[in-house]
Amino acid sequence: MAKRDYYEVLGVNRDATDEEIKKAYRKLAMKYHPDRNPDNPKAEEHFKEAKEAYEVLSDDQKRAAYDQYGHAGVDPSAAAGAGAGGFGNFADAFGDIFGDIFGGGGGGRRSNVYRGADLRYNMEISLEEAARGTETKIRIPVMAECETCHGSGARPGTQPVTCSTCGGHGQVRMQQGFFSVQQTCPKCHGSGKMVKDPCPTCHGGGRVKQHKTLSVKIPAGVDEGDRIRLSGEGEAGVNGGPPGDLYVVVHLKKHPIFERDGANLHCEMPISFTTAALGGEIEIPTLDGHAKMKVPPETQTGAVFRLRGKGIKPLRSNEHGDLFCHVIVETPVKLTERQKELLRELEDINQQDSGKHSPREKSWMTKVKDFFQ
Protein backbone atom coordinates (compact mmCIF):
# COMPACT_ATOMS: atom_id res chain seq x y z
CA MET A 1 0.00 0.00 0.00
CA ALA A 2 1.36 3.43 -0.95
CA LYS A 3 2.36 5.74 1.86
CA ARG A 4 0.11 8.66 2.60
CA ASP A 5 1.39 12.19 2.13
CA TYR A 6 3.13 13.28 5.35
CA TYR A 7 1.33 16.63 5.40
CA GLU A 8 -1.99 14.81 5.08
CA VAL A 9 -1.04 12.44 7.90
CA LEU A 10 -0.51 15.36 10.30
CA GLY A 11 -3.43 17.33 8.87
CA VAL A 12 -1.40 20.46 8.07
CA ASN A 13 -0.82 22.56 4.95
CA ARG A 14 2.39 22.24 2.97
CA ASP A 15 3.46 25.71 4.12
CA ALA A 16 2.83 24.92 7.80
CA THR A 17 5.27 26.36 10.35
CA ASP A 18 7.44 24.20 12.61
CA GLU A 19 5.16 25.07 15.53
CA GLU A 20 2.03 24.02 13.62
CA ILE A 21 3.66 20.71 12.69
CA LYS A 22 4.72 20.08 16.29
CA LYS A 23 1.25 20.93 17.61
CA ALA A 24 -0.45 18.63 15.10
CA TYR A 25 1.90 15.76 15.96
CA ARG A 26 1.38 16.14 19.71
CA LYS A 27 -2.38 16.03 19.22
CA LEU A 28 -2.19 12.81 17.19
CA ALA A 29 0.38 11.26 19.53
CA MET A 30 -1.90 11.87 22.52
CA LYS A 31 -4.87 10.40 20.65
CA TYR A 32 -3.22 7.26 19.26
CA HIS A 33 -0.49 6.47 21.81
CA PRO A 34 -0.38 2.69 22.44
CA ASP A 35 -0.61 3.22 26.22
CA ARG A 36 -3.97 4.92 25.71
CA ASN A 37 -5.16 2.33 23.19
CA PRO A 38 -4.16 -1.11 24.43
CA ASP A 39 -5.05 -4.02 22.13
CA ASN A 40 -5.85 -1.59 19.31
CA PRO A 41 -3.51 -2.31 16.38
CA LYS A 42 -5.14 0.39 14.23
CA ALA A 43 -4.27 3.07 16.79
CA GLU A 44 -0.68 1.81 16.91
CA GLU A 45 -0.46 2.07 13.11
CA HIS A 46 -1.74 5.66 13.22
CA PHE A 47 0.77 6.49 15.97
CA LYS A 48 3.70 5.10 13.97
CA GLU A 49 2.50 6.88 10.83
CA ALA A 50 2.28 10.22 12.65
CA LYS A 51 5.71 9.71 14.25
CA GLU A 52 7.30 8.93 10.89
CA ALA A 53 5.72 12.02 9.32
CA TYR A 54 6.88 14.24 12.21
CA GLU A 55 10.46 12.94 12.08
CA VAL A 56 10.70 14.03 8.45
CA LEU A 57 8.77 17.32 8.55
CA SER A 58 10.41 18.54 11.77
CA ASP A 59 13.88 18.23 10.21
CA ASP A 60 14.60 21.09 7.79
CA GLN A 61 16.93 19.02 5.61
CA LYS A 62 14.61 16.01 5.40
CA ARG A 63 11.60 18.24 4.82
CA ALA A 64 13.33 19.99 1.91
CA ALA A 65 14.19 16.62 0.36
CA TYR A 66 10.62 15.41 0.88
CA ASP A 67 9.15 18.58 -0.65
CA GLN A 68 11.38 18.14 -3.67
CA TYR A 69 11.29 14.38 -4.22
CA GLY A 70 8.38 13.09 -2.14
CA HIS A 71 8.84 9.85 -0.18
CA ALA A 72 11.71 8.86 -2.45
CA GLY A 73 13.76 11.78 -1.11
CA VAL A 74 13.71 10.43 2.46
CA ASP A 75 13.08 6.71 2.02
CA PRO A 76 14.98 4.68 -0.59
CA SER A 77 12.29 1.96 -0.56
CA ALA A 78 9.72 4.50 -1.75
CA ALA A 79 11.47 5.13 -5.08
CA ALA A 80 9.47 4.56 -8.22
CA GLY A 81 9.91 1.12 -9.71
CA ALA A 82 9.77 -0.69 -6.36
CA GLY A 83 7.76 -3.88 -6.55
CA ALA A 84 4.90 -5.02 -4.34
CA GLY A 85 5.72 -4.94 -0.66
CA GLY A 86 8.74 -2.67 -1.16
CA PHE A 87 11.11 -5.43 -2.35
CA GLY A 88 12.27 -3.44 -5.36
CA ASN A 89 13.42 -5.02 -8.60
CA PHE A 90 14.49 -8.65 -8.10
CA ALA A 91 16.89 -8.75 -11.04
CA ASP A 92 18.56 -5.48 -10.04
CA ALA A 93 19.11 -6.62 -6.46
CA PHE A 94 20.84 -9.86 -7.44
CA GLY A 95 22.66 -8.17 -10.30
CA ASP A 96 24.40 -5.93 -7.76
CA ILE A 97 25.48 -8.87 -5.62
CA PHE A 98 26.71 -11.23 -8.35
CA GLY A 99 27.97 -8.42 -10.56
CA ASP A 100 30.60 -7.59 -7.96
CA ILE A 101 31.60 -11.22 -7.59
CA PHE A 102 31.72 -12.16 -11.28
CA GLY A 103 32.31 -8.75 -12.83
CA GLY A 104 28.89 -8.52 -14.45
CA GLY A 105 28.03 -5.08 -13.10
CA GLY A 106 24.30 -5.72 -13.46
CA GLY A 107 23.11 -2.49 -11.79
CA GLY A 108 22.95 -0.18 -14.80
CA ARG A 109 21.99 3.48 -14.86
CA ARG A 110 18.60 4.39 -13.42
CA SER A 111 16.42 7.21 -14.59
CA ASN A 112 15.00 7.87 -11.06
CA VAL A 113 11.72 9.19 -12.36
CA TYR A 114 9.16 9.65 -9.59
CA ARG A 115 5.42 10.10 -9.80
CA GLY A 116 4.00 13.20 -8.14
CA ALA A 117 2.15 12.90 -4.84
CA ASP A 118 -1.62 12.48 -4.75
CA LEU A 119 -3.55 15.29 -3.09
CA ARG A 120 -6.79 15.33 -1.08
CA TYR A 121 -9.35 18.13 -0.95
CA ASN A 122 -12.28 18.07 1.48
CA MET A 123 -15.40 19.65 -0.04
CA GLU A 124 -18.57 20.51 1.86
CA ILE A 125 -21.80 20.56 -0.13
CA SER A 126 -25.48 20.85 0.76
CA LEU A 127 -27.92 17.94 0.71
CA GLU A 128 -29.66 19.52 -2.27
CA GLU A 129 -26.37 19.71 -4.20
CA ALA A 130 -25.65 16.08 -3.36
CA ALA A 131 -29.08 15.03 -4.61
CA ARG A 132 -29.06 17.02 -7.85
CA GLY A 133 -25.35 17.29 -8.61
CA THR A 134 -23.40 20.51 -8.99
CA GLU A 135 -20.28 22.05 -10.49
CA THR A 136 -18.01 24.27 -8.44
CA LYS A 137 -14.53 25.78 -8.55
CA ILE A 138 -11.84 25.05 -5.98
CA ARG A 139 -8.42 26.61 -5.38
CA ILE A 140 -5.68 24.29 -4.15
CA PRO A 141 -1.97 24.63 -3.29
CA VAL A 142 0.28 22.27 -5.30
CA MET A 143 3.91 21.63 -6.10
CA ALA A 144 3.89 22.31 -9.85
CA GLU A 145 6.60 21.96 -12.47
CA CYS A 146 8.70 25.10 -12.69
CA GLU A 147 7.85 26.90 -15.92
CA THR A 148 11.22 28.65 -16.06
CA CYS A 149 13.38 25.51 -16.22
CA HIS A 150 10.64 23.00 -17.20
CA GLY A 151 11.45 20.85 -14.19
CA SER A 152 15.20 20.46 -14.73
CA GLY A 153 16.14 22.70 -11.79
CA ALA A 154 18.90 24.32 -13.87
CA ARG A 155 19.10 27.91 -15.03
CA PRO A 156 17.77 28.29 -18.60
CA GLY A 157 20.59 27.67 -21.06
CA THR A 158 22.34 25.21 -18.74
CA GLN A 159 21.83 21.54 -17.89
CA PRO A 160 22.24 19.49 -14.70
CA VAL A 161 25.52 17.57 -14.51
CA THR A 162 26.07 13.94 -13.60
CA CYS A 163 26.45 13.37 -9.85
CA SER A 164 30.10 12.69 -9.07
CA THR A 165 29.26 10.50 -6.07
CA CYS A 166 27.03 7.92 -7.75
CA GLY A 167 28.10 8.48 -11.36
CA GLY A 168 24.54 9.19 -12.39
CA HIS A 169 23.08 5.93 -11.06
CA GLY A 170 21.17 7.65 -8.25
CA GLN A 171 22.37 4.93 -5.89
CA VAL A 172 25.66 4.04 -4.24
CA ARG A 173 27.01 0.65 -3.21
CA MET A 174 27.88 -0.03 0.39
CA GLN A 175 29.99 -3.08 1.27
CA GLN A 176 28.52 -5.19 4.05
CA GLY A 177 30.60 -8.29 4.63
CA PHE A 178 30.57 -10.42 1.48
CA PHE A 179 27.68 -8.50 -0.07
CA SER A 180 27.29 -5.19 -1.79
CA VAL A 181 24.09 -3.32 -0.97
CA GLN A 182 22.60 -0.39 -2.83
CA GLN A 183 21.41 2.78 -1.13
CA THR A 184 20.02 6.05 -2.40
CA CYS A 185 22.82 8.50 -3.11
CA PRO A 186 22.99 10.98 -0.21
CA LYS A 187 24.34 13.74 -2.44
CA CYS A 188 21.78 13.81 -5.27
CA HIS A 189 18.95 12.08 -3.33
CA GLY A 190 18.56 9.49 -6.06
CA SER A 191 18.24 11.79 -9.07
CA GLY A 192 21.68 10.94 -10.50
CA LYS A 193 22.18 14.61 -11.37
CA MET A 194 23.44 17.75 -9.68
CA VAL A 195 22.47 21.31 -10.49
CA LYS A 196 25.54 23.54 -10.62
CA ASP A 197 23.72 26.69 -11.75
CA PRO A 198 20.26 26.61 -10.10
CA CYS A 199 17.15 28.04 -11.71
CA PRO A 200 16.39 31.46 -10.13
CA THR A 201 12.69 30.60 -9.85
CA CYS A 202 12.70 27.17 -8.18
CA HIS A 203 16.26 27.38 -6.75
CA GLY A 204 17.18 24.01 -8.25
CA GLY A 205 14.16 22.05 -7.10
CA GLY A 206 12.45 21.81 -10.48
CA ARG A 207 9.10 22.46 -8.80
CA VAL A 208 7.46 25.49 -7.22
CA LYS A 209 4.53 26.01 -4.89
CA GLN A 210 1.52 27.33 -6.73
CA HIS A 211 -2.21 27.73 -6.32
CA LYS A 212 -4.40 26.51 -9.14
CA THR A 213 -8.13 26.79 -9.70
CA LEU A 214 -10.02 23.73 -10.89
CA SER A 215 -13.62 23.09 -11.89
CA VAL A 216 -15.08 20.04 -10.15
CA LYS A 217 -18.25 18.29 -11.29
CA ILE A 218 -20.13 16.62 -8.45
CA PRO A 219 -22.45 13.92 -9.83
CA ALA A 220 -26.01 13.60 -8.54
CA GLY A 221 -26.43 11.08 -5.73
CA VAL A 222 -23.04 11.40 -4.01
CA ASP A 223 -22.94 10.61 -0.30
CA GLU A 224 -20.75 11.41 2.70
CA GLY A 225 -17.17 10.24 2.13
CA ASP A 226 -17.48 9.62 -1.62
CA ARG A 227 -14.27 10.45 -3.54
CA ILE A 228 -14.04 12.09 -6.93
CA ARG A 229 -10.73 11.53 -8.73
CA LEU A 230 -9.20 14.20 -10.95
CA SER A 231 -6.42 12.43 -12.83
CA GLY A 232 -3.16 14.33 -13.22
CA GLU A 233 -4.23 17.23 -11.00
CA GLY A 234 -1.99 16.28 -8.08
CA GLU A 235 1.62 17.36 -7.61
CA ALA A 236 4.10 17.42 -10.47
CA GLY A 237 6.38 14.41 -10.87
CA VAL A 238 10.14 14.49 -10.36
CA ASN A 239 12.61 14.22 -13.26
CA GLY A 240 9.81 14.10 -15.82
CA GLY A 241 7.68 11.64 -13.86
CA PRO A 242 3.88 11.70 -14.23
CA PRO A 243 1.82 13.96 -11.96
CA GLY A 244 -0.23 12.57 -9.10
CA ASP A 245 -4.00 12.70 -8.85
CA LEU A 246 -6.35 14.91 -6.85
CA TYR A 247 -9.06 13.25 -4.77
CA VAL A 248 -12.02 15.44 -3.83
CA VAL A 249 -13.71 13.98 -0.74
CA VAL A 250 -17.40 14.86 -0.32
CA HIS A 251 -18.78 15.95 3.06
CA LEU A 252 -22.45 16.82 3.57
CA LYS A 253 -23.49 19.90 5.53
CA LYS A 254 -26.06 19.38 8.28
CA HIS A 255 -29.55 20.00 6.88
CA PRO A 256 -32.11 21.95 8.96
CA ILE A 257 -34.94 19.51 8.11
CA PHE A 258 -33.71 16.22 6.65
CA GLU A 259 -31.32 13.52 7.77
CA ARG A 260 -29.93 11.23 5.09
CA ASP A 261 -29.64 7.46 5.40
CA GLY A 262 -28.29 6.19 2.10
CA ALA A 263 -31.03 6.70 -0.47
CA ASN A 264 -33.67 7.50 2.16
CA LEU A 265 -34.45 10.74 3.96
CA HIS A 266 -35.92 11.20 7.44
CA CYS A 267 -37.62 14.22 8.97
CA GLU A 268 -39.64 15.08 12.07
CA MET A 269 -43.26 16.03 11.47
CA PRO A 270 -44.87 18.07 14.29
CA ILE A 271 -48.70 18.03 14.21
CA SER A 272 -51.29 19.53 16.53
CA PHE A 273 -53.04 17.23 19.00
CA THR A 274 -56.39 17.97 17.33
CA THR A 275 -55.03 16.85 13.94
CA ALA A 276 -53.57 13.78 15.63
CA ALA A 277 -56.94 12.96 17.21
CA LEU A 278 -59.28 13.84 14.36
CA GLY A 279 -57.04 13.34 11.34
CA GLY A 280 -56.49 15.79 8.51
CA GLU A 281 -54.29 16.81 5.62
CA ILE A 282 -50.93 18.49 6.17
CA GLU A 283 -48.21 19.93 3.94
CA ILE A 284 -44.70 18.56 4.30
CA PRO A 285 -41.40 19.64 2.68
CA THR A 286 -39.50 17.45 0.21
CA LEU A 287 -36.40 18.09 -1.89
CA ASP A 288 -38.73 18.67 -4.85
CA GLY A 289 -41.01 21.16 -3.08
CA HIS A 290 -44.03 20.71 -0.83
CA ALA A 291 -46.27 17.64 -0.83
CA LYS A 292 -49.63 16.97 0.83
CA MET A 293 -50.11 14.01 3.13
CA LYS A 294 -53.20 12.65 4.89
CA VAL A 295 -52.94 12.01 8.62
CA PRO A 296 -55.36 9.32 9.82
CA PRO A 297 -57.39 9.87 13.03
CA GLU A 298 -55.90 8.72 16.37
CA THR A 299 -52.29 9.18 15.19
CA GLN A 300 -49.76 8.90 18.02
CA THR A 301 -46.29 10.37 18.57
CA GLY A 302 -43.72 8.03 17.04
CA ALA A 303 -45.87 7.03 14.08
CA VAL A 304 -43.89 6.96 10.83
CA PHE A 305 -45.35 7.80 7.42
CA ARG A 306 -43.58 6.90 4.21
CA LEU A 307 -43.59 8.88 0.97
CA ARG A 308 -42.26 6.62 -1.76
CA GLY A 309 -39.80 8.06 -4.25
CA LYS A 310 -39.25 11.29 -2.29
CA GLY A 311 -35.74 10.37 -1.20
CA ILE A 312 -32.48 10.49 -3.19
CA LYS A 313 -31.39 8.52 -6.24
CA PRO A 314 -27.90 7.25 -5.32
CA LEU A 315 -24.99 6.95 -7.71
CA ARG A 316 -25.21 3.94 -10.01
CA SER A 317 -28.91 3.44 -9.25
CA ASN A 318 -32.09 4.10 -11.22
CA GLU A 319 -34.45 4.26 -8.24
CA HIS A 320 -35.12 7.02 -5.74
CA GLY A 321 -35.22 6.29 -2.03
CA ASP A 322 -38.16 7.20 0.22
CA LEU A 323 -38.95 9.98 2.69
CA PHE A 324 -39.90 8.85 6.20
CA CYS A 325 -41.85 11.36 8.32
CA HIS A 326 -41.68 10.78 12.09
CA VAL A 327 -44.73 12.18 13.89
CA ILE A 328 -44.42 14.38 16.97
CA VAL A 329 -47.76 15.35 18.54
CA GLU A 330 -47.34 18.82 20.00
CA THR A 331 -48.84 19.79 23.33
CA PRO A 332 -50.47 23.23 23.06
CA VAL A 333 -48.84 26.07 25.02
CA LYS A 334 -49.90 29.56 26.16
CA LEU A 335 -53.54 28.53 26.40
CA THR A 336 -56.39 31.01 26.91
CA GLU A 337 -58.86 30.49 29.74
CA ARG A 338 -61.47 29.30 27.25
CA GLN A 339 -59.06 26.70 25.83
CA LYS A 340 -58.20 25.47 29.32
CA GLU A 341 -61.89 25.18 30.13
CA LEU A 342 -62.54 23.07 27.03
CA LEU A 343 -59.60 20.79 27.81
CA ARG A 344 -60.83 20.25 31.38
CA GLU A 345 -64.26 19.42 30.01
CA LEU A 346 -62.68 16.92 27.63
CA GLU A 347 -60.75 15.35 30.51
CA ASP A 348 -63.94 15.03 32.59
CA ILE A 349 -65.71 13.27 29.72
CA ASN A 350 -62.75 10.95 29.29
CA GLN A 351 -62.76 10.03 32.99
CA GLN A 352 -66.50 9.36 32.91
CA ASP A 353 -65.99 6.96 30.02
CA SER A 354 -63.50 4.94 32.12
CA GLY A 355 -60.56 6.11 30.02
CA LYS A 356 -61.57 4.28 26.88
CA HIS A 357 -60.42 7.31 24.85
CA SER A 358 -56.91 7.00 26.31
CA PRO A 359 -56.20 3.25 26.16
CA ARG A 360 -52.45 3.58 26.71
CA GLU A 361 -52.90 5.70 29.83
CA LYS A 362 -55.50 3.27 31.18
CA SER A 363 -53.19 0.31 30.51
CA TRP A 364 -50.28 2.09 32.18
CA MET A 365 -52.33 2.95 35.28
CA THR A 366 -53.44 -0.67 35.54
CA LYS A 367 -49.80 -1.83 35.43
CA VAL A 368 -48.83 0.69 38.13
CA LYS A 369 -51.71 -0.46 40.32
CA ASP A 370 -50.71 -4.12 39.91
CA PHE A 371 -47.09 -3.23 40.69
CA PHE A 372 -47.90 -1.78 44.12
CA GLN A 373 -50.32 -4.52 45.14
From Swiss-Prot:
Keyword Secreted: no
GO CC term, one of those recorded: cytoplasm
Domain J residue range list: 5-70
Job of this protein: Participates actively in the response to hyperosmotic and heat shock by preventing the aggregation of stress-denatured proteins and by disaggregating proteins, also in an autonomous, DnaK-independent fashion. Unfolded proteins bind initially to DnaJ; upon interaction with the DnaJ-bound protein, DnaK hydrolyzes its bound ATP, resulting in the formation of a stable complex. GrpE releases ADP from DnaK; ATP binding to DnaK triggers the release of the substrate protein, thus completing the reaction cycle.
PROSITE patterns, sorted: DNAJ_1 (PS00636), DNAJ_2 (PS50076), ZF_CR (PS51188)
Compartments reported by the entry: Cytoplasm
Binding site for Zn(2+) 1: C146, C149, C199, C202
Domain commentary: The J domain is necessary and sufficient to stimulate DnaK ATPase activity. Zinc center 1 plays an important role in the autonomous, DnaK-independent chaperone activity of DnaJ. Zinc center 2 is essential for interaction with DnaK and for DnaJ activity.
Cofactor(s) for this UniProt protein: Zn(2+)
Cofactor binding remark: Binds 2 Zn(2+) ions per monomer.
Zinc finger (CR-type) stretch: 133-211
Disordered: annotated span: 346-373
Entry coiled-coil feature ranges: none
Biased composition annotated in UniProt, kind: Basic and acidic residues: 354-373
Gene name in the database record: dnaJ
Pfam hit, one: DnaJ
UniProt-annotated binding residues for Zn(2+) 2: C163, C166, C185, C188
Keyword terms: Chaperone, Cytoplasm, DNA replication, Metal-binding, Repeat, Stress response, Zinc, Zinc-finger
UniProt protein name: Chaperone protein DnaJ
GO biological process: chaperone cofactor-dependent protein refolding; DNA replication; protein refolding; response to heat
Gene Ontology MF annotations: ATP binding; heat shock protein binding; unfolded protein binding; zinc ion binding
Domain of life, per lineage: Bacteria
Family statement drawn from the similarity comment of this UniProt entry: Belongs to the DnaJ family.
Gene3D superfamilies from the UniProt entry: DnaJ domain, Heat shock protein DnaJ, cysteine-rich domain, Urease metallochaperone UreE, N-terminal domain
CXXCXGXG motif repeats: 146-153, 163-170, 185-192, 199-206
Cited HAMAP family: DnaJ
